[in-house]
Amino acid sequence: MIIYFAIYCFLGYLLESCYVSILQRKWISSGLLKGPFIPLYGLGALLLILLFPYLHTSYYLSFFVGGIAMTILEYFASVYIEKAFHTRCWDYSRHPCQLHGRISLFYFIIWCFLSLLFIQYIHPFFMSLNIMNDSVSLICLIYLGFILKAFIDRLQFHKINGLDIH
């Protein structure tokens, strides 16, 4: 699972950075942490992997249940990030059909399509690579170490600057 977490953190970073860069018309390195990874995408991927046995046989389930699961994760991640880091990484309050600016109908639909692609095509592709060998595991553990270090650095930055972290 660590391998998949690392891969999908990186792919999520690429996806989000490309999306934001297209909107801004210049390269933007997305994410709360420094480095080429966004843990929310890794967590989302792990959630979908846990649901995979129940969803992969149906495009409809992959689409709707995956989208609902990812939207719920996005909501609670937004709450956690705001409380832990005193920052808001996204704000959908100007979108129609949104809830507390944390989730919106537009991004729910995006999550539905991404969940469908992930469950039906992306994750089966990575499973077929049979990447569970020692060297890849070592690389992923090192990568996970970078993610943890970036997270710890972020917490220490807030602590040094006198911000309350819960």
Predicted feature locations:
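Aromatic-rich, lipid-facing transmembrane alpha helices and their immediate juxtamembrane interface loops
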Residues: 1-166
